[in-house]
């Protein structure tokens, strides 16, 4: 039986780990190197390092911090935020990343996923999708086919600041076609709220693609992690708040998932 993964997430800005609610109201959560080492020791299956303001600030990759984090962890490390080109993938892999996550750059130029995947392999290429449920007004938006787009989720770029108008399910399918190896799916509506994943969104994307889907956004209890897998169909679950402030350890999370009948790496 394939085990399900628990991924600890470091949202980084200004050289510090932070956590907000709905992508705003950021609260400090510590030094990224120290936090990464803690999750490595706790037995996290993977670590995600996301520079959440690199794109909006038009800033370069923070390679020294990434290298320092990579030196402290012996689990797969995914790095995202400010990744724009195939050359950036090479720079991050050389800095110690195992996978590289594209978001806004893939929206601006989807071909970058084709080229990066062809050169480095799909197993290295993650596409992050920040999705927000459409309002009633947005659901009436007319598509190129002349019909209302209807209920669903729009894809946002630039750290959740811009609505691209792309449909999240269609975008995930296109990213799979272009060579992505994994989808990191964040519900902007649930981010930091601690009320659980958007399970409808998670299930819809999981059913739409044949790729591993990482559920992100909204974890407040250990049951939420299990729900993301059992109800949402996710292959991995990502959390930040419940781990950052000492409420739970990764080990406790794995024990809880096992108690719910979910296979985890111990």
From Swiss-Prot:
Give the record's pathway: Amino-acid biosynthesis; L-histidine biosynthesis; L-histidine from 5-phospho-alpha-D-ribose 1-diphosphate: step 5/9
Domain of life per record: Bacteria
Do you know which CDD domains this protein is assigned to? HisF (cd04731)
Predominantly, its location class is cytoplasm
Q: Which HAMAP family match?
A: HisF
Gene Ontology MF: a single term: imidazoleglycerol-phosphate synthase activity
Species whose genome carries this gene: Verminephrobacter eiseniae (strain EF01-2)
UniProt cross-references to Pfam families, sorted A to Z: His_biosynth (PF00977)
Tell me which Gene Ontology terms the entry assigns under biological process: L-histidine biosynthetic process
Q: What is this protein called?
A: Imidazole glycerol phosphate synthase subunit HisF
